[in-house]
């Protein structure tokens, strides 16, 4: 009789321990890994909120008054990690890459760029090798802008918007961006970074100069979390509109003037994700400007 009673108790105790162990494991297992488990072994508890937000947030039926566009220039290798940070909060960004630099030291590989696009981020053009367009003649401008877009389209990306390297733009560069099939182009600067009377604090919801969309300069290593928050709050308090932010490298300890610390970016994204209830949403530049994927002109052949 003792053996008969002892066995169920041991089995019950072991079952409890196994269940507790599975629960602890489920609490630390990434959402992607949980998704691959058989349906017969669901996780015992819900993963943390940050792990759950791996898909873009569904667009609200209420039109936001303020739209923040998070843009990342130059195809730096740190952008693979930056994209994952955005995904943690259900946000998506625009990544402007130089097609001729992919795979080079310090730059994204083609596989990394494909993963960024697959996660729902926008891929945009940035010239073949980051040429300063105002140093080129109109034909050279058109050649690098069109060749870059042609290459990215050939990789399978829906390339609809462009960013001028260094923010350097003139009339012929704007025309080249249009002629090469882009629906919009972003520059650097033009939006106030400090409070001032009558200053521009955001683009209109539909930018008036769609081939010269402005930003509050570039985010630098000395741009504080509080300052980035103020950019957004000033836009909210002044009627809203489109606020594009331009980032470059993302580094844990800083890696030059044109960089943002990983911790600061993470904190900013976490804060930004809470602004939806205030009428502020995060969208890609292509989401805002719209338009179909237009063809790029055929490459000219020199006789």
Locate predicted features.
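Aromatic/hydrophobic pocket-lining residues that form the small-molecule binding cavity
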Residues: 79, 109, 141, 145, ...
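Secretory targeting and sorting signals
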Residues: 1-31, 35-36, 40-41
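C-terminal domain-boundary segment and adjacent tail
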Residues: 45, 51-62, 93-94, 103-104, ...
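Non-membrane alpha-helical structural segments and their capping/turn regions in soluble enzymes
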Residues: 138-143, 222-225, 259-262, 266
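Metal-dependent polysaccharide deacetylase catalytic core of the NodB/CE4 family, i.e.
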Residues: 65-68, 87-217, 241, 246-252, ...
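A Trp-anchored, charged/polar loop motif used as the substrate-binding/catalytic surface
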Residues: 219-233
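Short, glycine/acidic-enriched loop or turn micro-motifs at the edges of active sites
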Residues: 76-77, 129
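DG-centered beta-turn motif at the end of beta-strands
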Residues: 70-75
């Amino acid at each position: 009789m003792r053996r008969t009673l002892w066995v169920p108790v041991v089995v019950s105790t072991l079952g409890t321990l196994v269940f507790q162990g599975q629960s602890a494991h489920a609490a630390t297992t990434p959402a992607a890994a949980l998704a691959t488990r058989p349906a017969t072994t669901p996780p015992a508890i819900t993963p943390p909120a940050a792990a759950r937000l791996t898909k873009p947030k569904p667009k609200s039926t209420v039109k936001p008054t303020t739209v923040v566009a998070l843009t990342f220039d130059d195809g730096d290798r740190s952008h693979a990690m930056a994209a994952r940070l955005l995904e943690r909060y259900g946000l998506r960004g625009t990544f402007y890459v130089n097609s001729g630099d992919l795979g080079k030291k310090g730059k994204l590989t083609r596989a990394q760029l494909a993963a960024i696009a697959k996660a729902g981020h926008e891929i945009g053009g940035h010239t073949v090798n980051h040429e300063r367009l105002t140093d080129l003649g109109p034909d050279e401008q058109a050649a690098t802008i069109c060749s870059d877009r042609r290459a990215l389209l050939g990789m399978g990306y829906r390339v609809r918007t462009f960013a001028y390297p260094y923010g350097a733009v003139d009339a012929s560069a704007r025309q080249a961006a249009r002629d090469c099939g882009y629906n919009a182009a972003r520059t650097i600067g033009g939006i106030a970074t400090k409070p001032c009377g009558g200053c521009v604090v955001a683009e209109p919801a539909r930018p008036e100069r769609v081939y010269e969309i402005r930003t509050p300069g570039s985010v630098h290593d000395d741009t504080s979390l509080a300052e980035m928050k103020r950019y957004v709050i000033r836009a909210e308090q002044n009627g809203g509109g489109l606020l594009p932010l331009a980032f470059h490298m993302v580094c844990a300890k800083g890696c030059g003037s044109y960089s943002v610390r990983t911790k600061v970016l993470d904190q900013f994204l976490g804060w930004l994700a809470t602004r939806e209830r205030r009428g502020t949403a995060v969208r890609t530049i292509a989401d805002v400007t719209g338009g179909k994927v237009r063809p790029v002109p055929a490459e000219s052949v020199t006789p």
